[in-house]
Amino acid sequence: MTIEAIIAMQACARIGLTHSVVFGGFSSKSIQERVMDAEAKLIITADYQFRGGKKIPLKNIVDDAIAMGGCTSVQNIISLQRTKEDISLNPDDILWSDLIKNQKDECDPVFVDAEHPLFILYLSLIHI
């Protein structure tokens, strides 16, 4: 997990958005299912994740999940570019670096009801 992921989670909490952290090892199908279930409007991802000496193409996996269909709620994808490789951007994609360029130093909080969900956490269940 990157510092930008922590920033994104905290920013969501600050402005009253529900977030869901998805394990980087999930398949496109698993991501598609979670996006559809949560009716996600925004996806924040990175071009790659490095785990166990391997480079995992997160942005490509997200693009594949969206291409499967059914993720009609998604309006934008924000991508953190961690490598110097070209990143495949779709028309509605935004680079993290472009997004934060002109942001203010402070952001007023958005107040929500006490019952408003802070996050959605998906677990893998083992059936015995």
Report the location of each language-model feature:
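Conserved AMP-binding/adenylate-forming
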Residues: 1-32
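Short acidic/polar active-site loop segments enriched in Thr and Asp
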Residues: 18, 41, 75
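Conserved ATP-dependent adenylate/AMP-binding module captured primarily in the ANL superfamily
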Residues: 26-69
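Conserved residues at the C-terminal ends of beta-strands
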Residues: 46, 80-81
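Flexible, active-site-proximal loop/turn residues at the rims of small-molecule/cofactor binding pockets
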Residues: 49, 83-84, 105
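Short helix-terminating capping/connector loops at secondary-structure junctions
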Residues: 70-74
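Conserved pre-ATP/AMP-binding loop-to-beta segment of ANL
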Residues: 75-79, 88-122
